[in-house]
Structure formats: C-alpha cells, structure tokens
Amino acid sequence: MFSLYKKFKGLFYSVLFWLCILSFFSVLNEMVLNVSLPDIANHFNTTPGITNWVNTAYMLTFSIGTAVYGKLSDYINIKKLLIIGISLSCLGSLIAFIGHNHFFILIFGRLVQGVGSAAFPSLIMVVVARNITRKKQGKAFGFIGSIVALGEGLGPSIGGIIAHYIHWSYLLILPMITIVTIPFLIKVMVPGKSTKNTLDIVGIVLMSISIICFMLFTTNYNWTFLILFTIFFVIFIKHISRVSNPFINPKLGKNIPFMLGLFSGGLIFSIVAGFISMVPYMMKTIYHVNVATIGNSVIFPGTMSVIVFGYFGGFLVDRKGSLFVFILGSLSISISFLTIAFFVEFSMWLTTFMFIFVMGGLSFTKTVISKIVSSSLSEEEVASGMSLLNFTSFLSEGTGIAIVGGLLSLQLINRKLVLEFINYSSGVYSNILVAMAILIILCCLLTIIVFKRSEKQFE
C-alpha cells in the first residue's frame, strides 16, 4: 500500500528524518505553551480549570487522532494523510494566532492543531513497521524516541524565552514551520493502493463524546457530564463488542498484562502531566518568577534528563527485570512529590532538582510499560495494541492536565488540609502533591500484586 522508491533505499532514512521533525513539532506543540498557562489565565482572567483547556483541547484531538490515523493508514495512502495532517496543523496554528484574544477561537484553533499534529507520531510508526526489518526497527525507534525527547526538553525552554521576550501568542505559529516538509514528502513518497477496509466511525464518535464529557466533568465537576460520560461509554463498549471491525479490539480487555500496562501507564502519565502543568502556577504564586525562568531553570533540566534516564532504564530492565525498574520509577516520582510538598516554600531550586527525578521516574515507568504491553501481544495484535497504548498515553496526559486545572480552581482544597505549617497560598499545591504521591504508591502496589499473581503471563 505504501512504499518508497526502491532504487534509492538511502532516501528512506531521509524520509525518516523529516518525519521525526514532524513528530518533534507535535511534541513541542504540547509542551511549549505549558509555562505560559499562568500568563494566559491572567490575559483572559480565567481560572486554571478553564485555562488548562488550551493544552487539554490539543491533547484531546491529538490522542483521538493518533488512533484514527493509524486506522486510516490501512486504506488511505500515508502520503495523503501526512499532507492533510500538516495542512490542518498549520491551519489550526493560524486560527489560534489570529484569534488569540478570543478564548473560544483560541481553543478551536488548538483543537484543529491537535487533529493535524496527531498524524505525525502515529504514521511514523506505520512507516517504520512497513519499511524496516524487525532487526533494525530498534535503532529507528531509538532515533524517533531521541527526537521526541528533545522536543519535550526544548519545549518549555523555547516557550519561556518567546513568551517572556515577545508574547505567548507567537508560540501558536511555531508548528507552521512544518509546511516546508510538504514539497519534500510529495517528491520522495509515492502514493500506495487503498484497501476496502472499513473504519468504525460510530465507535470513534461514541468514544470521542464520552471522553469530552469526562474532561468537561473534571473542569467544573458538574455531575451531568459524568452521567453522560457513563452512558456514552457503556454504549461504546456494547458497540465494539458487536461490530466486525471495531475501533478498539475488545479481546484486548482479556489480556491481563496488557490491561495492567494500560492502566498503570495511563494513571502515571496522567499524574505526571498534571504535575508538569501545575509547576508554572506554583512558581508564579510562591516565587513570582517569569516564564523564561520557569521554562529554562525549573522545567528544562528535568525534561532533558529523560534522554539519559531512558537509556539507563532500558539497561536496568534487561539486568534487573521490569518489576524492579517499575518500582524504582514509582518510588522516584512519589518521593519527589512528597519532598516538594513538604518543602514547597524552601527554595525554587529544590523543585528544579526534584523535577529531574520525577522525569527520571517517568522515563523508567515508560520503558517498563512499553515492554509489558509489547511482549503481551501476539503478532496480529501488535498494531492495534500499541496504537491503543499511544492513544491511552496521550489521552491520559490531557486528562491529567484537565483534572489538575479543575483542582486548582476548587476552593475545597485551597486550604491547609495536610500540612499545617504550609502557608495558605502554598497549601493547594502541597495537598495535590501529597494526593499524587499516594496514587502513585497505590498504583505501584496494585501492579506488584497483579504482576506476582500473573507472573507467567509476563514472561
């Protein structure tokens, strides 16, 4: 269905490089606005729960899109899908930039950005899977991972500098740089043949509605949205169990290691993403620092450390096993959260230091989750299973950002609930951090129990 010019095999790696650039900007687009959330809240005079939708909106369509593009690649050639993705990403950037003074136009632009950018990470996996032998796929995925990690690391730094010295609205047009890749992709990538596979549009719509309802619930805690989420989610589950080509394979639900990886990964990714989105608010409230300082001095060291921890985590998994590395990663995250919670007013640099270990722990758990999920799938299930893992990861991050934004807006936790010696202005952050640490520990304990009971299935 899709191929590169056979006579010029060397061009494949050039194509891979350009696709990595696209993935870089998709991740950059996720991280770059994070440090500016407090400034955006001041600009629109909105609560964190509402403001965080600037990132949540992007992650919402981005997560759904990653799964949809993977399905579409089965019967629409990748060249067309990539061009559509780039075009939508640039269109969304333009809409958001022009309408940045109008909140709902800004959100709409971010939704369109997410739809377009979702094409890049999902389709690059398809390109590698179809054009590189299994023996060489490790190097390709390693290269992709490094580029993505670089985007995660540079995002806060670039965002802080541009927002501080120019204006946060200019961050919205950064993805438009990807338009320069279109002529190259048109020249090198040739169209393939489409198949007669059908796409489960009803399943996509039902799942999307249920996700939107849940995220709206986390923003203002209106129980109507939770009821609607439950209704649409139940309908979605019944739907995928009846159709012949479901959007999500219901048989995967019976795979214990796969579901454990999905649950544990989703919870941890959600919590850490929420923490990252909370840091700029915390730094602004307690230390009154500008966005450039937040991006370069607080967040940047931690996000860049992921590259080192990722390599070290892979080494430890081979030597000590998946469970050991997962426990180590979970402890690193939870201890870091508790340290910041107890000493949140001590020094900004303590947060910087502990942020490194939060991201290190996240890198360890990501390595383990990927191995658990991939090793639990048969050859026929790999494509749909890994696609579902990517979807869950991105969706969890968006959900975490929405939940933390909603919690920061709640008056109930804006008081000294846990640590009496913390000032009221810092109490909300300490409360959330302690709750996050407890959830991470409970997740770790659950993983250990399930892992021990089903140890043979994890081998």
UniProtKB/Swiss-Prot annotation:
Topology class, membrane: Multi-pass membrane protein
Organism in which the protein naturally occurs: Staphylococcus aureus
Family: Belongs to the major facilitator superfamily. TCR/Tet family.
GO terms for biological process, alphabetical: proton transmembrane transport; response to antibiotic
GO cellular component: plasma membrane
PROSITE patterns linked to this entry: MFS
Transmembrane segments: 12-34, 49-68, 81-100, 105-127, 140-162, 166-188, 201-218, 223-240, 261-283, 293-315, 322-344, 348-370, 391-413, 428-450
Organism classification: Bacteria, Bacillati, Bacillota, Bacilli, Bacillales
One GO MF term attached to the UniProt entry: antiporter activity
Keyword annotations from UniProtKB, A to Z: Antibiotic resistance, Antiport, Cell membrane, Hydrogen ion transport, Ion transport, Membrane, Plasmid, Transmembrane, Transmembrane helix, Transport
Location of this chain's protein in the cell: Cell membrane
Stated name of the protein: Tetracycline resistance protein
Role summary: Resistance to tetracycline by an active tetracycline efflux. This is an energy-dependent process that decreases the accumulation of the antibiotic in whole cells. This protein functions as a metal-tetracycline/H(+) antiporter.
Pfam families: MFS_1
Gene expressing this chain: tet
